[in-house]
């Protein structure tokens, strides 16, 4: 141990000296490259994979550090002397060299904390070859500072750590294509093993080892290391594990450089290390010009058996690589893998097919079909469903459910369903029975044939022919079993099973009779064994093909006893006849008592099997019925839950309060009649207490009890779109970061718009009256075409089409509508009113005269269809007409949110509350203030006040912000017992609000072509507003972003389902004619499906182009010049309101 410690001390001293020498070598730059290579050859050879790879990766390090020859020689001599003094080193070691193999090459990258190395001996002649290669390499690329640093780190390691880590360094480290993009390719390398035999001449034999597959290859593979950079260090650490340095302890004998035979002579030194390996790495390219070859020596002491076999041999491992060979390796591996995977997948496919086949058979055995009481969305309800539902609720006794003899459900629908399921169950079992009995037949057939030939029947050919004929027929029957179970014939499985089993039992019963009659009985004892064999054969065939079908039909098949008794009777009759005939013909062979016992046995077995079948069928029927009832109840619960979820309305806080109070009242009423005061009273009072707490929570959580709860919506996107439609008057600045460039003082961008402007013209009442005188009423009256009431009350009346075809469509439709009201208003006042109303509508894509006319027509139509129009007073009808035609008068094509965000004067006047709706009502009564246009001037002041309030309420109700509030109020009133819109004016008002709102958004309930056109128009307005908002650096309003055009379909579906449908659904509750359900809601659902189809097909939704329409209008004939006298009163009204 002392010598070992001295050796370690020498190593440490040597390391210190080397550190000093390295510093000197860095300062020494005077020696040439040739001197450096010469000194290295004399003293030591150092090659590290670390230094090589670092040079390869770091192209910037082009400065070459020269070596100080004198210091290297001096240090290596000291090292050699210290080793010579050690007694642990044998004399043979003096002839060898020390080889250090290190695991780290990336210390400079801060990846490894320590550099571990192992040390072992090799013959000098091996190192000679390595040094020769190193010389050639160094002539091209001299040693760098990295290599010297690696040498210093390698010799500074503890020898004990080196020895412990020796086993961890293997030949098979990966040097495959160092490309960080693919780590897996680094394991694909090949080793060429060159074995040398101990003989006078050395024989080399190439063995190619493919490491990934452990298969021999016939081609050499090469691996190129290139295209690496500094970012690849981390992956390089995973791919290259070894760096190698050579340490020479003695001078190299130049005479042994090319002497390969010295390898064999030096094998005596391998007793301690067992083998020597020479590894050549080829193909390391640098800048595609330098090719370096490192010959290194390594060993692996893990494989003891392999090392003992080659104890006397020198194994030469060559790693050859190139860029092209890597592809071959991958190809070969892939081919092997593909072949293996193909075979494996084929087996898996076959196995999966069989598994699926038998799984389907098993599934059919446990499945209960319920088609008889299932409902189809496309077909009308099955009448059997109601019958079965009634039977489910009337299951009070077994007598009412089942008829015991024969077993049968009293309800024909349940019996039909039971038979349907029987066929399903039996069909799967027929396949199994067919397969099993076929296998059994193929076993029995040759055995019975051999028995027949060796028995007394061998001389009678017709018996053998009959047997084979019956076996062939029996085989066909069994094959038919499989066919029935596997094809569409399975719906007749029960009937076919009875027929086939009856045929099988009858055939072998007749065979039993024939074979019994032809049996020759000879009392000679020598022939008794043969006769016994013959009887055994008869018994086997009788039980397998005669009695076994009975067992199957009674136990394995869920058959019905009212039919399978026939098979039992056939078996008893034929087999009893057989034994009776044999007993009569050969009484000596079959005594009478034996005949009696056999008949009793057959009869008893059949009776007990039948009783068992009856009991089993009874149990199956009860289980089937219970499962059927349970399934029906589960389906009903599931259906109720779906209906509850789908019908769950968007409720307001006030509705929740009312419902909770109703529930609380119901519980309190139940408590009044409660008898169990100990338990139920406490439970129900606690329940009421919880309800009241929820009421308090609802009352205090919001200042507006008509706010809706969006939590009922499952999809968050629906909430987003609903808020976009019903919250258009809320500023986008609330709670949000203020966009840059927005002026909060007064944004005049919209004020300067052509639609609404305060400084365009300055008109007064005198000028307006002057223009009114210019209206040629008589000429207009002649041009107007009146429309029939039936056409106006048709829901499919298309205003878009009519406006394209008629010259004065606005006057045609609206004058026809006002004429349906019994009034005494002069025609000239009506025409003047209509002229001013038409002129106040702007030429925008959606909110124009066409929309106003459509709403008025749909308002009239809905009132007629609901049956309330004829019950209304004429002044209420007139209110409906004025509200409908003026509900969007003066609409600029921008919504309330735009006015609020732009701080428009109208928004300031109306305090951001229903800006446009207030504006529409204001313009309406500005027109009615004109004596020549006031169609209400003949009413009393009281009626006028009432009508004015109604008109204002109806126009303001078209603000979508109040959409769900109005629906909630109507629902609350409708559910009240005293709801009466004829006697109660408040009920009438809320009802008319519902109708005008339905008319306002009625385009969702019309035909798809018309609905699609209206959607194109409203999109055009939305996007125009969005463009204006972007232009003025305002926040984009919902639905106005052109970049989100792909959301149109989804937004329309949400609008129809969650905004329009609740409105029509509430109206359907007062619709005795069922028009809403059969027409409006049906169209709504159909249009939703169309939008959903467009969304799935990703169809592009075209947007209405006003420019193209204007160009089209120019080509039309010019309108009457008198029509140009219509006055735009918008500016006048705004000016007066502002004053």
UniProtKB/Swiss-Prot annotation:
Enzyme Commission number: 3.1.4.35, 3.1.4.53
PROSITE patterns named in the record: PDEASE_I_1, PDEASE_I_2
Residue spans crossing the bilayer: 430-450, 463-483, 499-519, 537-557, 565-585, 593-613
Extracellular face residues: 451-462, 520-536, 586-592
Cytoplasmic compartment residues: 1-429, 484-498, 558-564, 614-1139
Region named Disordered: 1-42, 154-177
GO biological process, one term: cGMP catabolic process
Subcellular location per the Swiss-Prot or TrEMBL entry: Cell membrane; Endoplasmic reticulum membrane
GO cellular component: endoplasmic reticulum membrane; plasma membrane
Listed name of the protein: Dual 3',5'-cyclic-AMP and -GMP phosphodiesterase beta
